[in-house]
Swiss-Prot record:
NCBIfam families: NDH_I_L (TIGR01974). It is a multi-pass membrane protein. It catalyses: a ubiquinone + NADH + 5 H(+)(in) = a ubiquinol + NAD(+) + 4 H(+)(out). Core subunit of the mitochondrial membrane respiratory chain NADH dehydrogenase (Complex I) that is believed to belong to the minimal assembly required for catalysis. Complex I functions in the transfer of electrons from NADH to the respiratory chain. The immediate electron acceptor for the enzyme is believed to be ubiquinone. The chain crosses the membrane at residues 4-24, 38-58, 87-107, 117-137, 140-160, 171-191, 211-233, 241-261, 273-293, 301-320, 331-351, 366-386, 409-429, 457-477, 488-508, 583-603. It comes from the Eukaryota. This is NADH-ubiquinone oxidoreductase chain 5. It is found in: Mitochondrion inner membrane. Keywords: Electron transport, Membrane, Mitochondrion, Mitochondrion inner membrane, NAD, Respiratory chain, Translocase, Transmembrane, Transmembrane helix, Transport, Ubiquinone. Its main location: mitochondrion. Its EC number is 7.1.1.2. GO terms for biological process: ATP synthesis coupled electron transport; electron transport coupled proton transport.
C-alpha cells in the first residue's frame, strides 16, 4: 500500500511537467499542445495502477501527510487522502481530459493562442485533482478556488465578445456567493474543532450541527449550479466547446457534489440537511429539464441536461446514498463529454451554426458523429447496458425504496422521463429529416483527432458503467431487493419519455402557434429567472440611486438650500419690515380713480 502515494505523486509530476518546463520556453513551440496531450495520456496510464491496487487491497483509505507549518495551535499539512473516491475519479478525469485535449487539437487548430489554451486546460485539471485528493479544508479550498478562476479564464476565452465576458463574470459572481458558505464553514470548523483535517472534523464536530453543513450546501449549490444559483451554467456555453466538455463532464460542476460526498459522514446523521439537499436537487432537476425542452441552441440543451443530472446527484445524496452519486459522476463524465464533442463536430461542420432548427439530415453527411450522438443520448437517458443505466437504475431503485419526501422523489421521476424527451428532440432536429442548412457548406469529419477522441469516449459510454459499478463498495446500507414491477421502473420511465417525445413530435409537426403559450414561454425564457434576477434588481437599484442623488443632491442642496432659500428669506424679510402691502395694481387703481374724480369736479 506504500506504492499508492508514490504512484499518485508520479502521475501528478507527469501532469505538471509541461508547466514545470516553462523556463525552457517549451510552451512557445508549436508542439506544446501535443506535449500536454501526451502528458495527460501518460498520467492516465500511471493513475490506473494505484486504482487497480486499491480496488483489490480491501483498504478503506491511505493518507499521506507532509507537515508544512504551524500557526499557534493550528497545524497545516500537505495531506492527501487516497480513498475509493479519489483513486477512481482520477483515471476517469484524466481519460476524459485526454480525449478532450485531442479533440481540442482539431477544434482550436486555427486559434493563435492555442498553447495558452492548453496550459489553461491542464491547470484546470490539476486544480480539480488537488480538490479530490485533499485531506484538509485548506488544500480543498485551494483546489476549489483554482477550478473557479480557471473556469473564469476559459469561459471568457474569446474575450472580444461581450457575451463571453458577461458569462465569465456571471460564473464568477454566482460562485462567489457559494464561496461565502465555504469560507463560513471553514471558519466554523476552525473555531469549534481547531483543525481543518477531515478525520479530526468528523470525530470532534457534533453530528446534529446544521450551521456548517448549511454553508457547505450553499457552496455546493454555487459550484454545481443548483436552483437559485444555476443561471451561470447555460451562460458558460459562450466558451469554446472543449471548455464546455471539460467543465460539464469531470471538473468544475461536479466539485460541489464531490464536496458533499466528502462530508457525508457529517450529513448522514443530520436529517434536516439531507431533506434540504433532496429538495434543492429535486427542484433543480425538474426546473432545468423543463427549460431544456424548448431551447434551440444545441449546446444549451446539453448544458441544461448537465444541470438536471447534477440535481439528480444531489437527490441521491439527499436520500443518503453518496456512493451512487459518485458512480453517477463517473458514468456521466463519459457520455456528457462525448455529447459536447459531437455538438462541437456539428457546429464546426456547419460554420459555427448552433441553432438546431437550422440543421437536419446530418445522419447522411456525418455518420460517425450521428452514431456517437445517438449512443451518448441513449446513455444519458439510461438505456439498459449502456454506461448511464448502471447509475440511473440504481438511483431510481434507491429512490423507489426511500421513505423521505414523496413529492421530491415524484418530481425527480418526472424530470428523469423528460431526459428522454429532450434527447429525442436533439436527435430528431439535428440528424433526421431534410437538411435545413446552406448547401455550399463543406462537411468533413474524417480527421483522426476528432474520430479517435470520440471513439474512446464512445467505448467509455458503453463499458465504463459496468466496470465501475462492479467495483463499487457501498458507503451506506444499500436498499433491499424489490419486486420486478418496481425494478423495471428505470426502464419504464425512459421508455415513457421516448414514447412521449415521439407522440408530441408527430402531433405538433404541422402545428403552428400564432402566439406561444404561457408554458412554452416559461420554459423558453428559463422560468423568467434571468429577467427577474438579472434585470429587475439592477433596474430598481439604479432607479433608487438616481432618485436619491437627483432628489437629495440636486433638488435639496443645489436648488432648495441655497438659491431658493435665499430668495425666500429676503422676500419674507422685506414683507415683514415693509409698511406697505406691495399691492401695486390696487395702488395704481386708487390713484386713477382719485385723478378721474378730481378732473370731473374741476370740469
Amino acid at each position: 500500500m506504500n506504492m499508492l502515494p508514490t504512484l499518485t505523486l508520479i502521475s501528478l509530476i507527469i501532469l505538471t511537467s509541461p508547466i514545470m518546463l516553462s523556463p525552457l520556453r517549451i510552451h512557445e513551440t508549436r508542439n506544446f499542445p501535443h506535449y500536454v496531450k501526451m502528458a495527460v495520456s501518460y498520467a492516465f496510464m500511471v493513475s490506473m495502477v494505484p486504482a487497480m491496487i486499491f480496488m483489490h487491497s480491501g483498504h478503506e483509505a491511505v493518507i499521506s501527510n507532509w507537515h508544512w507549518m504551524t500557526i499557534h495551535t493550528l497545524k497545516l499539512s500537505l495531506s492527501f487522502k487516497l480513498d475509493y473516491f479519489s483513486l477512481i475519479f482520477m483515471p476517469v478525469a484524466l481519460f476524459v481530459t485526454w480525449s478532450i485535449m485531442e479533440f481540442s487539437l482539431w477544434y482550436m487548430n486555427s486559434d493563435p493562442y492555442i498553447n495558452r489554451f492548453f496550459k489553461y486546460l491542464l491547470l484546470f485539471l490539476i486544480t480539480m485533482i488537488i480538490l479530490i485528493t485533499a485531506n484538509n479544508l485548506f488544500q480543498l479550498f485551494i483546489g476549489w478556488e483554482g477550478v473557479g478562476i480557471m473556469s473564469f479564464l476559459l469561459i471568457g476565452w474569446w474575450y472580444g465578445r461581450t457575451d463571453a465576458n458577461t458569462a465569465a463574470l456571471q460564473a464568477m459572481i454566482y460562485n462567489r456567493i457559494g464561496d461565502v458558505g465555504f469560507v463560513a464553514a471553514m471558519a466554523w470548523f476552525l473555531l469549534h474543532s481547531n483543525s481543518w483535517e477531515l478525520q479530526q472534523i468528523f470525530l470532534t464536530v457534533p453530528k446534529g450541527n446544521t450551521l456548517p453543513l448549511t454553508g457547505l450546501l450553499l457552496a455546493a449549490m454555487g459550484k454545481s449550479a443548483q436552483f437559485g444559483l444555476h443561471p451561470w451554467l447555460p451562460s458558460a456555453m459562450e466558451g469554446p466547446t472543449p471548455v464546455s466538455a471539460l467543465l460539464h463532464s469531470s471538473t468544475m460542476v461536479v466539485a460541489g457534489v464531490f464536496l458533499l460526498i466528502r462530508f457525508h459522514p457529517l450529513m448522514e446523521m443530520n436529517p434536516s440537511i439531507l431533506t434540504l439537499t433532496l429538495c434543492v436537487g429535486a427542484i433543480t432537476t425538474l426546473f432545468t429539464a423543463i427549460c431544456a425542452l424548448t431551447q434551440n441552441d444545441i449546446k444549451k440543451i446539453i448544458a441544461f441536461s448537465t444541470s438536471s443530472q447534477l440535481g439528480l446527484m444531489m437527490v441521491t445524496i439527499g436520500i443518503n446514498q453518496p456512493h451512487l452519486a459518485f458512480l453517477h459522476i463517473c458514468t456521466h463524465a463519459f457520455f456528457k463529454a462525448m455529447l459536447f464533442m459531437c455538438s462541437g463536430s456539428i457546429i464546426h461542420s456547419l460554420g459555427d451554426e448552433q441553432d438546431i432548427r437550422k440543421m437536419g439530415g446530418l445522419y447522411k453527411t456525418l455518420p460517425f458523429t450521428t452514431t456517437a450522438l445517438i449512443i451518448g443520448s441513449l446513455a444519458l437517458t439510461g438505456m439498459p447496458f449502456l454506461t448511464g443505466f448502471y447509475s440511473k437504475d440504481l438511483i431510481i431503485e434507491a429512490m423507489s425504496s426511500s421513505y423521505t419526501n414523496a413529492w421530491a422523489l415524484l418530481i425527480t421521476f418526472i424530470a428523469t422521463s423528460m431526459t428522454a424527451v429532450y434527447s429525442t428532440r436533439i436527435i430528431f432536429f439535428t440528424l433526421l429529416g431534410q437538411p435545413r442548412y446552406p448547401t455550399l457548406i463543406q462537411i468533413n469529419e474524417n480527421n483522426p483527432l476528432l474520430t479517435n477522441a470520440i471513439k474512446r469516449l464512445m467505448l467509455g459510454s458503453i463499458f465504463a458503467g459496468f466496470l465501475i459499478s462492479s467495483n463499487l463498495p457501498p458507503t451506506t446500507v444499500p436498499p433491499m431487493t424489490m419486486p420486478h414491477h418496481l425494478k423495471f421502473m428505470a426502464l419504464a420511465v425512459t421508455l415513457l419519455g421516448f414514447a412521449l417525445a415521439i407522440e408530441l413530435s408527430s402531433f405538433t409537426y404541422h402545428l403552428k402557434f400564432d402566439y406561444p403559450s404561457h408554458t412554452y414561454k416559461f420554459s423558453n425564457m428559463l422560468g423568467y429567472y434571468p429577467t427577474i434576477i438579472h434585470r429587475s434588481p439592477p433596474h430598481y437599484l439604479l432607479n433608487t440611486s438616481q432618485n436619491l442623488t437627483s432628489t437629495i443632491m440636486d433638488l435639496a442642496w443645489l436648488e432648495k438650500s441655497i438659491p431658493k432659500s435665499l430668495a425666500l428669506m429676503q422676500k419674507s424679510a422685506s414683507t415683514t419690515i415693509s409698511n406697505q402691502k406691495g399691492m401695486i395694481k390696487l395702488y395704481f387703481l386708487s390713484f386713477l380713480i382719485s385723478l378721474t374724480l378730481g378732473l370731473l369736479l374741476i370740469i
